[in-house]
Amino acid sequence: MEFPNCTVVDHPLVKHKLTQMRRVETSTASFRALLQEISLLLAYEALRDLKVREEDIQTPMARTVAPVLDGKKLVLVAIMRAGQGILDGMLQLVPSARVGHIGLYRDPETLSPVEYYYRVPGQLADRDVVVCDPMLATGNSAVAALQRLKKSKPGSLRFVCLLACPEGLTNLREHHPDVHVYTAAIDERLDEHGYILPGLGDAGDRLFGTK
């Protein structure tokens, strides 16, 4: 099955690090470090088309014209709580980015998202916004977060995740065909509880050591 709204970052380092994260014996500290490392590599691909402009600068040897990022500062939005792991990695690459958080939890019965927190930078209009969440499972949380952000009319929206599955990608494409997804892998399917298979377990619990 092909997903035109999704780019899988096909790189040996990404594949290797993801395999280490999947292992049940991987410690919380290692899981956290690996997620930050993969996030850097995902960010490189997701931000490939950011606009640049030419600026006159002075090097130690001569004056020259060189490219710098153009436009308003990038905004990174983490879907709490596991999205913080990807956010931390991306901030190493773009430390000047503005940061927002959306708190959503999944109702265990309906699998629908319930919002409990929303705090993003003001004036999102015309800004490039990247939404971060390790797992694109049912896609319901991603759909809800993107819908909320669209009310502020951002210039562009992208979604960065560690793992996706066909169900989540299809759901997101149906509701937000304009949003491109960047991921390390597309796994097989969801189980009856809405978890990705083969997956890596609950990303939030493994990231924060809460289980």
From Swiss-Prot:
Listed CDD domains: PRTases_typeI (cd06223)
Swiss-Prot/TrEMBL GO biological process terms: UMP salvage; uracil salvage
Keywords of this entry: Allosteric enzyme, Glycosyltransferase, GTP-binding, Magnesium, Nucleotide-binding, Transferase
Positions of 5-phospho-alpha-D-ribose 1-diphosphate binding: R81, R106, D133, P134, M135, L136, A137, T138, G139, N140, S141, D202
An MF annotation (GO) of this entry: magnesium ion binding
InterPro entries: PRibTrfase_dom, PRTase-like, Upp_B, UPRTase/APRTase, Ura_phspho_trans
A Pfam family reported for this protein in Swiss-Prot or TrEMBL: UPRTase
Annotated cofactor note: Binds 1 Mg(2+) ion per subunit. The magnesium is bound as Mg-PRPP.
Enzyme class: transferase
PANTHER family: ADENINE PHOSPHORIBOSYLTRANSFERASE, URACIL PHOSPHORIBOSYLTRANSFERASE, CHLOROPLASTIC
Protein family (similarity comment): Belongs to the UPRTase family.
Function recorded in the entry: Catalyzes the conversion of uracil and 5-phospho-alpha-D-ribose 1-diphosphate (PRPP) to UMP and diphosphate.
Name the UniProt record assigns to this protein: Uracil phosphoribosyltransferase
Species name: Myxococcus xanthus (strain DK1622)
Lineage: Bacteria, Pseudomonadati, Myxococcota, Myxococcia, Myxococcales
